[in-house]
């Protein structure tokens, strides 16, 4: 089975878990939790959120 990565936080998703967000243009985003889903819907950037994979990388650079 194919493992997917959470679009927002970067965590690996087990097959059959998580949420799928589909935009009107047909692009799809996989989310691991409602926390990631709500942050994405609010327009927050993963690199500015400290608990995400991309945010942790940004903290190391600063």
Swiss-Prot record:
* GO MF assignments: rRNA binding; structural constituent of ribosome; zinc ion binding
The leader peptide range reads none
Q: Where does Zn(2+) bind?
A: 6, 9, 32, 36
The UniProt keywords, alphabetically, are:
Metal-binding, Ribonucleoprotein, Ribosomal protein, RNA-binding, rRNA-binding, Zinc, Zinc-finger
Check the record and name the CDD domains matching this protein: Ribosomal_L24e_L24
Its biological purpose is as follows: Binds to the 23S rRNA.
Protein name, as recorded: Large ribosomal subunit protein eL24
Task: Give the source lineage, highest ranks first.
Answer: Archaea, Methanobacteriati, Methanobacteriota, Stenosarchaea group, Methanomicrobia
């Amino acid at each position: 089975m194919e493992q997917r990565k959470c679009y927002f936080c970067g965590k690996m998703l087990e097959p059959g878990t998580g949420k799928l967000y589909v935009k009107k243009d047909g692009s799809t985003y996989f989310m691991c939790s409602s926390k990631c889903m709500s942050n994405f819907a609010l327009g927050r950037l993963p690199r500015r959120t400290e608990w995400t994979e991309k945010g942790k990388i940004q903290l190391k650079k600063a």
